[in-house]
Amino acid sequence: MLQLEHVTYRVSDEQGEKTILKDVNLSLSERFVAFTGPNGGGKSTLAKVIAGIITPTEGKILFDGEDITPLSVTERAKRGISYAFQQPVRFKGLTVRDLISIAAGRSANVSDACAYLSEVGLCARDYLDREVNASLSGGELKRIEIATILARGTKLSVFDEPEAGIDLWSFGNLIKVFEKMHAELGGSVMIISHQERILNIADRIIVISAGSVKADGVKADVLPALLGTLDMGCRVTAGSDKEDCI
């Protein structure tokens, strides 16, 4: 489905040039892929490169065999790639119902909108006609954003640290949402996360550190290393949902 060929991304500032991604080569076809690794390792940059928010300095991105490297985020969305920001965007003047309708590509009726909001643990009657603005908390915005991804139903859904700003009760509900997506949807889900409970439901785990792939394999092979048996720059501590980056 998705191929990254020799993807490199560099930025320049007053201190010179810095390489954020270094010759990344990946082929992604699994239903559920989790990316993890230390903060600043390049995970979010890689997600934005896939979504089309930023363009790689070098390399090529193929989606269903098509070279999408030069395509904008809008064009990639039309081809079936959706992206959930780590910090969701607020839309003054746009209601939750409007946002779900835009995501679904049609006018969402009350029943459909309620179903999507219920999936993420929100009471529809309290949110449908609310504006997606500063009156909503970060956790509420995050759950609404995930509801729009569900409504969109794309071939590839990319989530950048979806647990950020989510309280403990909501986090348990979030895991159920991803488990259901994994079990029922025909598309693929790509999640950037440090959380053991999310990594534990992935078909494949990829560790990104210092802009490069440091480990890549099935959960049974990679997760024990992340839990402390092998130093790959970032360990996920079992049972604590915390990362220890070195």
Language-model features and meaning:
Residues A51:
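Helix-to-loop junction immediately C-terminal to a conserved catalytic motif
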Residues T36-N39:
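The feature captures the beta-strand-to-loop junction immediately N-terminal to the Walker
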Residues E161-P162, W169:
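Walker B catalytic motif
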Residues L2, T19-D23:
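Conserved structural motif at the start of ABC-family nucleotide-binding domains
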Residues D67-S82, L226:
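ABC ATPase NBD coupling module
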Residues G59-E66, D112:
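Conserved ABC transporter NBD signature motif
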Residues Q87, G93-N109:
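Q-loop/switch helix immediately C-terminal to the Walker
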